[in-house]
Amino acid sequence: MPLAVKSESGLMCCHSLPNEVMMPEFNEHILDKVLDPQDYRSDGSAYFMVWGRQHTQEQLDKLAKSWGVKLFCLGHAWVPGGIRAEFKNMLQLNSDHAKGVVLPVNLEKIQDATYTASMAIKLGSIRIDVT
């Protein structure tokens, strides 16, 4: 299973990103290499990509530049309203609870987190007819 998927236009979807304090130990090339057992350990870069919750704008900007990302779309954190745009280039969403959302994204033109979050659709508002 991949750690992340990235569109040519700059949307990266991943479970999480490393905590900011772990950046000195984080291998930014983790997405370009074959993972080895050390990457999965609690001090490994693959692990950091799954369990991080504390981010800063400076950190996000650095990773965005390194990876060619315009917008990070993350899960992992509990978001009571279903979606949150805490940083200009990172949003968090949940689809696994009563206020969960889905997010249509125009991959031809990636917008900032606030605009993109405004396009979220509450799962509870979607009607599915089963015949």
Region annotations inferred by a language model:
Residues K88-T131:
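Binuclear metal-dependent phosphoesterase catalytic core
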Residues P2-K6, G82-R84, G100-L107:
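Short beta-strand scaffold segments in enzyme catalytic cores
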Residues E58-L60, V79, M90:
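Eukaryotic intrinsically disordered and solvent-exposed regulatory patches
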Residues M1-W67:
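Active-site-proximal loop/helix segment associated with metal-binding centers of metalloenzymes
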Residues N19-V21, F72-R84, K99-V101:
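Active-site environment of divalent metal-dependent phosphoester hydrolases
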Residues M23-E25, I83-M90:
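Histidine/acidic-residue-rich catalytic or RNA/ligand-binding cores of hydrolases
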Residues A64-V69, P80, S95:
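Non-catalytic terminal accessory segments
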Residues M12, C73, L91-L93:
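Hydrophobic/aromatic beta-strand patches that form the interior of the parallel beta-sheet core
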